[in-house]
A protein has these predicted regions:
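Mixed-charge, low-complexity intrinsically disordered regions
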Residues: 1-25, 40-127
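Short, conserved beta-turn/loop elements at beta-strand boundaries and strand-helix junctions
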Residues: 30-37
Length: 127
C-alpha cells in the first residue's frame, strides 16, 4: 500500500461545509478507492458527495481528503488545521518549504474562498 501526506477534513464535525481539519499520513488501498487514516477506513464517494469525497465505512461520517497545498490554504473557509506529530517536520520542510516552523503543531488557513469574499465585499461597497 502506498502512503502519502494529505489534508483530511471531517465534514460531519461541523455544518457540512467545515469541520475538524488535519494534515496527516494516509495509506491507500491497491485500487486507491479506500484510504486508511488513524484507524478509520474511508471509502470514495465517487463524485457523489457534497463538499465531501470520502466517507467512513464504520461511522458514516463524511470527509474531504486532498493533497496539501503549498500555501496552506486547504480549507474552504478560515479555520485551524492540526498537523499530526509524525508528519510535522516533513510537512513544514518538504511541502510548505518553511523549515523555521517545524515545531508548529497547527496553523490557521484563511481558506479557499477568503479572497473571493474580500473582492465581493469591495465590489458591493463601490458607489
Amino acid at each position: 500500500m502506498q502512503d502519502r501526506i494529505m489534508y483530511i477534513e471531517n465534514k460531519s464535525d461541523g455544518d457540512g461545509l467545515t469541520g475538524s481539519a488535519r494534515i496527516g499520513r494516509v495509506r491507500f488501498s491497491k485500487t486507491g478507492k479506500t484510504i486508511y487514516y488513524r484507524g478509520a477506513e474511508l471509502q470514495s464517494l465517487k463524485g457523489y458527495g457534497y463538499k465531501a469525497n470520502y466517507f467512513d465505512v464504520n461511522t458514516g461520517d463524511y470527509f474531504w481528503v486532498s493533497g496539501p497545498k503549498k500555501n496552506g490554504q486547504d480549507t474552504l473557509y478560515p479555520d485551524r488545521v492540526e498537523v499530526d506529530e509524525d508528519v510535522r517536520i516533513e510537512y513544514w520542510r518538504d511541502i510548505r518549504g518553511i523549515e523555521a516552523t517545524v515545531d508548529e503543531s497547527s496553523f490557521r488557513s484563511e481558506g479557499k474562498h477568503a479572497s473571493w469574499r474580500v473582492v465581493q465585499f469591495t465590489k458591493s461597497r463601490k458607489v
